Amino acid sequence: VPDRYYGLIVIVVALVIFLGCIVSPPSLMDDVDAVQAQIARNMLESGDWVTPRLDGVVYLEKPPLKYWLIALCYLAFGVHDWAARIPVALGAVLLCWLTYQFGCWAESRRAGFYAGLALATCVGLFIFTRVLIADILVTLTITASIYGYMRAIEGREEESRRWALLGAAAMG
């Protein structure tokens, strides 16, 4: 396989693994999953996208990004278990692609390819796409910020600004 297709292969493998798993059981039976999904549903139904609530009580234990993404998926696809898992699954796919990019930059396309595939086939990452825990999204944003800042340090001035902006945007 020509090395120019490595990034595409990593994305396709990650999509098959992570998007394929969102439609299969189990449903949102765990307490944590149900709470996260219900908070997003409450946001959608109430129209209050600023303050997460559970049973009318303000729920500020977690950052709202995950709830916003789940609520947007509910808006687009309806309120379903699989729709609640889409943001985490897409976050995992993006994390695999970003790992590929990081490896390409740091070493070579082949190294990036193996790094992206290794992450895509990692059991731990797969398990985290099955539950609604924000760890994958946090890992994605931290990795993107580190990648952006690393690229900013070694780039030309114009490129450095763009990479630094990526790093800053990923940090929130």
Where are the predicted features?
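Membrane-integral, polyisoprenol-dependent glycosyltransferases
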Residues: V1-G172
